[in-house]
A protein has these predicted regions:
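Glycine-rich phosphate/ribose-binding loops and adjacent secondary-structure elements
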Residues: 1-149
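C-terminal extensions of enzymes
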Residues: 154-246
Length: 246
């Protein structure tokens, strides 16, 4: 947290935050405890998922290391709400967000905004050849080779990026209107539905635990999982406290 304060000072007060993929839940709660102890808060946090967003992501990492985006986002959102910090820190979400529904789904469970790269990469010609790290991208998107860069015709691709951006936001606006909403900030977990079986559906607000403001501070936590993770978390280390079962 002191490094965040240092960056903020050196940048003349510019917004400072960090992006991460959630690993062990107590590790982020340890960061949250450090926020409380130092009084130093990031301006924003971007939660990424384990889904693997770049063509250079190792196969061993993709889908195997870290927590999926929506699970991680919900945990971070709940932790900040439970500590009365959510209104002081903005939350972004990233990880295989392409369509308007992808955007709406993360806004509904806690994100203030969504980062999207994949769709725009497709718009400029990415074919997912998974050679980003080789400098030999066949479509000229991820390369420093002047010859290969010629494959990317900027005026043509710029129009495609513009069209994708405009139409994605238009689709999001249409989804909001269909739900009777006027602004993305009105989306909540009650607007998402999951089919559990052929005869049962549930709202996300019924499927997941949502902490109330200050709940972690009072100790009266709705859900044993959050209570246990909070007890395990340490402000001075990512190593957990051992919690003895009652």
């Amino acid at each position: 947290m002191h490094f965040i304060a240092q960056l903020r000072e050196l940048s003349g007060g510019k917004p400072v935050g960090f992006k991460f993929c959630l690993g062990h839940p107590w590790e982020f709660m340890g960061i949250a405890k450090a926020m409380l102890e130092t009084g130093i808060l990031p301006d924003f946090i971007v939660v990424d998922g384990k889904e693997g967003g770049t063509g250079a992501a190792p196969v061993e990492f993709t889908d195997h290391i870290g927590v999926p985006l929506r699970d991680g986002l919900l945990f971070v959102h709940n932790t900040l709400v439970g500590l009365n910090l959510r209104n002081k820190i903005k939350l972004g979400a990233s990880g295989k967000i392409v369509s308007a529904f992808d955007i709406a789904s993360v806004l509904a469970i806690g994100a203030d905004w969504a980062n999207s790269a994949r769709g725009f990469m497709f718009a400029i010609g990415c074919i997912q050849s998974q050679s980003c790290h080789t400098n030999k991208c066949p479509t000229g998107v991820a390369t420093q080779d002047p010859l290969r860069q010629r494959a990317l015709v900027v005026p043509d691709k710029a129009q495609r990026v513009f069209n994708f951006h405009r139409n994605t936001l238009k689709a999001l606006a249409e989804m909001l209107a269909a739900a009777g909403l006027e602004h993305p900030s009105q989306l909540s977990a009650k607007h998402l539905v999951r089919r559990m079986s052929a005869t049962e559906i549930k709202l996300f607000s019924q499927l997941h635990v949502f902490l109330k403001p200050g709940e972690l501070l009072t100790g009266e936590v709705n859900g044993e999982f959050y209570s246990r993770m909070w007890q395990m978390a340490r402000a001075d280390s990512f190593e957990p406290h051992e919690v003895v079962a009652a």
